[in-house]
């Protein structure tokens, strides 16, 4: 994944949690038109299609019904949207800004019309992160056809081989694959696991935060293990050392690695994720305990050599910003500097 320079995102269910508003609007539209009701799961399965295509998917309806449905939906949507609080999924805004700072070029390919898409992007102050927005009304064929991604690639001059498409539904993954890009399915949105697996994405992730390590080239299996088995352990620590802290250390470590391309990114990532786990035994010697936890981790031992594990253990032990001795390796310097970088933001919390 070290060749990835461009990222194309889906919007609904990937960046923003719009499902309550969409489902509410769908149900009101269906009732208004006297159509046969379906289950929420069946409604969710149509998110990602253009509005005009939904009646055909749910009721095998004619194109004329599709046009009527779309017009009714848009009118009801505008009436209801002020009643729903739309939020970004956890980690979206921070990760987008970090990816932007990393130099990745980003765009959105959505089935919603571009005016609505632009309004939401502007409302969350993330428009500067994107080179281009493509709505369902900008292309002749919508998802799962490749047209939205191809329009972005052509307009921006991006290569498909340097691009990854990220989405929560099978139509997003199929769109990206048809356009020749790598793909990443996020599992927290509207698509079911069965649907996502059947679309054969290049990668899958349960959290948006994990996307940055993946596109930076960290082994996706390591990212998955860390997200499921390591980061949740920070929930038991004091307020200054919970998930937000370890994620900041990870993010800052990845930033520092831009200037140190000779370092192994998998090693640096794991060092950052393990650096404070020793707090489970108290703060005084937590850096030593953290090193032992990393060294004895069975998953880590399947991915790294003994020499690499020794270096990683030393780096974890050397991470303390208040330590009097110089880190023994560049890896130790990276995690120490990453931890020290955020110290100013957390020093007050750490002394309470």
What positions do the PLM features span?
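Acidic/His-rich, divalent-metal-binding segments that scaffold phosphate/diphosphate chemistry
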Residues: 218-285
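Active-site neighborhood of HAD-like aspartate-dependent phosphohydrolases
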Residues: 1-45, 59
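Divalent metal-dependent catalytic cores for phosphoryl transfer on phosphate-bearing substrates
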Residues: 264-352
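Helix-loop "lid/cap" segments that line or gate small-molecule binding pockets
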Residues: 29-30, 50-64, 120, 152-153, ...
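Asp-based, Mg2+/Mn2+-dependent phosphohydrolase catalytic module
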Residues: 1-7, 97, 114, 118-220
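Short acidic capping loops at alpha-helix termini that bridge into adjacent secondary structure
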Residues: 38-42, 65, 128-132, 160-164, ...
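Short, acidic loop-to-helix structural element flanking the phosphoryl-transfer center
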Residues: 3, 79-108, 114-118, 146
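A metal-dependent, Asp-based hydrolase signature
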Residues: 47-80, 90-93, 97-98
């Amino acid at each position: 994944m070290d060749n990835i320079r461009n990222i194309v995102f889906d919007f609904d269910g990937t960046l923003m949690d719009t499902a309550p508003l969409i489902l509410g609007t769908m149900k009101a539209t269906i009732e208004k038109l006297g159509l046969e009701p379906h289950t929420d799961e069946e409604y969710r399965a149509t998110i990602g299609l253009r509005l005009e295509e939904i009646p055909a998917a749910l009721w095998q309806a004619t194109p004329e019904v599709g046009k009527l449905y779309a017009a009714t939906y848009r009118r009801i949507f505008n009436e209801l949207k002020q009643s729903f609080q739309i939020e970004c999924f956890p980690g979206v805004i921070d990760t987008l800004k970090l990816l932007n700072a990393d130099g990745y070029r980003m765009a959105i390919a959505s089935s919603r019309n571009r005016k609505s898409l632009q309004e939401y992007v502007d409302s969350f102050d993330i428009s500067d992160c994107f080179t281009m927005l493509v709505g369902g009304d900008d292309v002749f064929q919508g998802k799962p056809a490749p047209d939205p991604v191809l329009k972005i690639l052509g307009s921006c001059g991006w290569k498909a081989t340097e691009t990854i498409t990220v989405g929560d539904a099978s139509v997003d993954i199929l769109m990206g694959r048809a356009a020749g890009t790598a793909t990443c399915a996020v599992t927290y949105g509207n698509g079911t696991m069965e649907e996502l697996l059947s679309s054969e994405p290049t990668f899958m992730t349960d959290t948006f935060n994990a996307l940055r390590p993946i596109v930076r080239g960290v082994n996706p299996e390591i990212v998955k293990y860390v997200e499921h088995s390591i980061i949740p352990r920070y929930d038991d620590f004091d307020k200054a050392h919970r998930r937000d802290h370890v994620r900041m250390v990870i993010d800052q470590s990845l930033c520092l690695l831009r200037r140190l391309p000779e370092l192994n990114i998998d090693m640096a990532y794991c060092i950052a994720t393990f650096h404070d786990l020793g707090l489970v035994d108290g703060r005084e010697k937590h850096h030593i305990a953290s090193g032992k936890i990393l060294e004895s981790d069975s998953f880590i031992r399947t991915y790294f050599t003994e020499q690499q594990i020794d270096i990683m253990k030393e780096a974890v032990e050397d991470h303390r910003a208040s330590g009097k001795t110089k880190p023994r390796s560049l890896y130790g310097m990276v995690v120490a500097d990453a931890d020290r970088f955020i110290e100013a933001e957390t020093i007050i919390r750490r002394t309470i």
